[in-house]
Amino acid sequence: MQPPDTELRLLLLTSSYWPEHSPPQRRWTSLITTLCDQGWAVSVVAPVAHYGQGPDYNSDTKGHAWRVQHGFLGERIYRVPHLLLGDNRIFKLANQVIGAAGSVLRGVATGRQDAVVVTAPSLPLLGSALLVARFKGLPLVVEMRDAWPNLAEDASLVRGGSKSVINSAVEYVQNRADLVVTVTEGFARTLRERGVANVVTVRNGILMDRTPHLAAPPFDRERLEVLYLGNHGESQALDVLIRAAALVGEDMRLTFVGHGSQKPALRRLAMELGVNVRFLPPEYREAVFERYREADSLVISLRDDWKSFEDTIPSKTYEVLAIGRHITGIVRGEAANVLTEAGEGDIVGCKPQEIADLWRGLVADRGRLQPAGSGRAWVQHNAEYSDLACQYSELLRETIHEHRTHPPQSLGRRIARVGRAAVKVARNARSVRRSA
């Protein structure tokens, strides 16, 4: 096995990266911070920045197609094209295919590496990573950040014949990966039950030294301040929060911070019900902590009618646990288990009346808003990104060592493997189009 002080080179393929503000960006900029200290040189292949414009986003930092950027962590960023086609599912898929094709071309021309990591759920990008790894003769690490394709089935993104085709395509790549990484134990267990080998869990987390512990909220506040900060999409069932706030009335104020496809509909619902809801744009860094500071209870929410969410933990969970605020947990499965194990918050069902009953209880007894204090210690022990990055580094080194124990293949053999993989990926893509 390579000693820790030996520099190794990692190639990361992702659909979103800095200066965007997105789940893969937050995860990987946090991991890369420590990986570089662990002796890794990291190259990133990603589309021109276009989504979730973070605080560093501008015409220079977003990058240009086929150009190379030097990231602020010391990584090299290789940009591939992204076309502004539109926001519907067809256009999104088209852009994924374009980005995936560009990732193959760029990925094979990034110099020498020791391993390829792809962070999913983009199906086309999974195929790209397999092709790049085969061409360069490198081990492939597939990171499944969501319970996918289960989540796609729950959201009706795949139907009919396309369902089995997409499942087969994902399993094809997973079964040929040298290592599969999940962010929850539940989904890792699901993959093992399907026969996927070499599955490990490296959960999401936070950097504790950048996450303050806030003083308790005041006891004499006139109304309950409830905050949801995050994506406003179909997955979160945020309309239930508005309906619950309508039942509570003037004793509380609900604040939404962020953006997403459902935000216009949520605004309309709040107006129709006459609810005191404050809608704010996305906020970053210190502004987020100030928003937490003015809140009494922070909401973590996932809809309860998608089975895949039993194996899903919203990435904000760890930050909310560490910050020192009461948690309204509208979650089940593994996310609920984390809150229970950490000893923080109240878990309620995804029903307006249940949520309203909880909030009325908090209004009546503000002493319940005082966190137990065990959440931050739990995060320090289980979800500190510097520790998770060390775990990831060791797994990558073991995977590289195992891959190198096999006799290297000639370039001709590698090209033949790429050809076979490309044919399989192309067949799956055609099958998906015919089934759609």
Give the predicted meaning of each segment:
Residues 1-69, 246, 415-436:
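N-terminal subdomain of nucleotide-sugar transferases
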Residues 48, 186, 204-205:
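Carbohydrate-associated surface elements
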Residues 95, 136-139, 150-172, 208, ...:
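Nucleotide-sugar donor phosphate/pyrophosphate-binding loop at the beta->alpha transition
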Residues 101-108, 124-135, 161-182:
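Membrane-proximal helix-turn-helix segments that form the acceptor-binding/catalytic region
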Residues 218-236, 242-245, 255:
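Conserved donor-binding/catalytic core segment of Leloir-type glycosyltransferases
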Residues 223, 252-257, 264-290:
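Nucleotide-activated donor-binding/catalytic signature segment of Leloir-type glycosyltransferases, i.e.
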Residues 236, 284-291, 298-318, 326-338:
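Nucleotide-sugar-dependent
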Residues 350-353, 366-397:
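A charged, aromatic-enriched C-terminal amphipathic alpha-helix characteristic of glycosyltransferases
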